[in-house]
Amino acid sequence: MIDLYYYLIFIPLGYIVGSINFATIIAKIKNKDIKHIGSGNPGTMNMLRSVGKFWGCLTFVLDCAKGISFALIGRFVFKDNNLAMYVLGLSTVLGHIFSCFSKFKGGKGVATSLGAFAVISPITFAVAFTLMIGYLAFFKKGFIGSLMAICILVITNIVRNCLVRDNYYYVCLILLVLWLGLIFWTHRSNFKRIKNNTENSLSLFG
């Protein structure tokens, strides 16, 4: 019963915190409207391309922090409960994508998802993040590297849940599948641009 009360408190709070769009805030500080420059997406990649590397990296760190903070709440308040970490992490991702402060239009949820998985699966996160940066450095296609990292994290968590079968593991599996599907859905415009050979490139170190 106590856990239920915690869920009722932290899920809405996670959504509200997730709804804070740091790309929009930082771009405004720089006298720019991130939704009307570059790809129009208020997220890390567009910030890197359109506002600057430093500001893009700052956006990434702050967006990650949203997922990290609520996954940590899931870990410590709910005592390493996998379901709680998934639920609270996903609540921040939903806030980021469907921001209540921006008419339910936000970013694509990658950085916030990575932050959550950094707490849930730190070793796998380190591998996935390294591969993502490597892919971006060599091939300059940010969204493919991002999706690759998310796929690695979600699939390894699916496998882990299937093997360990903790309490409510089947709910965890459903959440993970929905999480992955949601991230792919937010990148539907990128897939269209790839198909039309108009996807933007990004030189991370150039």
Feature locations, PLM:
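Loop-to-transmembrane alpha-helix initiation sites
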Residues: 126, 142-150, 166-178
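Short, non-helical or kinked segments that cap or interrupt transmembrane helices
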Residues: 33-43, 101-114, 141-152
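C-terminal ends of transmembrane helices
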Residues: 23, 95-105, 131-139, 187-192
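N-terminal signal-anchor transmembrane alpha helix
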Residues: 5-29
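Cytosolic, membrane-interface loops and tails of multi-pass inner-membrane proteins
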Residues: 24-55, 188, 192-206
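Nucleotide and nucleotide-moiety/phosphate-recognizing core
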Residues: 6, 55-61, 65-100, 132, ...
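Interfacial segments of multi-pass membrane proteins
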Residues: 48-51, 74-77, 109-139, 151-161
